[in-house]
């Protein structure tokens, strides 16, 4: 079970580093709703494609709310944590604690 989860994680990171053959531009009318399967964050209306090991894949989900763990920005195709919603910033007051969404 642990090996399978590790393999899924490694494959997800590799997919994030490969060039994509599809057009996932911001102007695309094919944006997916929360809960739909995705392979790139720009496919999602929320702009967050989150890896879900329990459901064996990646799915569109909303960005992080106040107090939720976050990433400062989306760099690859898939997210382990989502960036913050508009109006919130992702930072940590303590370098030993994970980043959280907070009011600007």
Swiss-Prot record:
Record family assignment: Belongs to the colipase family.
Principal place of residence: secreted
Subcellular location(s) of the protein: Secreted
Gene3D superfamilies found in the cross-reference section: Lipase, subunit A (2.10.80.10)
GO term, biological process aspect, one: digestion
Disulfide topology: 38-49, 44-60, 48-82, 70-90, 84-101
Signal peptide: 1-19
GO cellular component, one term: extracellular region
Name of this protein: Colipase-like protein 2
The entry's keywords: Disulfide bond, Secreted, Signal
Originating organism: Rattus norvegicus (Rat)
Sample GO molecular function, one term: enzyme activator activity
């Amino acid at each position: 079970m642990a090996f399978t989860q590790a393999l899924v994680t490694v494959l997800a990171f590799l997919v994030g580093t490969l060039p994509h053959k599809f057009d996932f531009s911001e102007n695309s009318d094919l944006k997916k709703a929360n809960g739909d399967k995705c392979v790139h964050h720009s496919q999602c209306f929320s702009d967050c494609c989150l890896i879900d090991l329990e459901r064996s894949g990646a799915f569109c989900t909303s960005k992080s709310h106040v107090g939720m763990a976050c990433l400062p920005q989306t760099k690859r195709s898939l997210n382990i944590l989502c960036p913050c919603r508009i109006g919130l910033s992702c930072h940590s007051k303590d370098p030993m604690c994970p980043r959280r969404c907070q009011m600007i």
